[in-house]
Amino acid sequence: MTVQSAASDDAAIEMANDVRYGLAASVFSENVGRAMKVAARLDFGTVWINEHLFPLASEMPHGGFKESGYGKDMSLYSMEEYTRIKHVAVKLA
């Protein structure tokens, strides 16, 4: 984990998203509303606010973006990775 400061929210978001991987990130701020807005713009599968490596909730999707993997594990969303939906219609008479 690295800790970096930036001149503005836009600069911080640009710096954070300018990486090949996107598993997890943290935003530290006294203003939680501002941190939520930043978190929404980060290209990471998990974003913690004022915490890092906080335990993940098992009912929430877990997985990375970009080159940090494909899909979401440990939740109902993971079922979509193993499911193919097919529509079959049969005329019986």
Where are the predicted features?
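Conserved C-terminal structural/oligomerization subdomain of aldehyde/semialdehyde dehydrogenase
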Residues: M1-A93
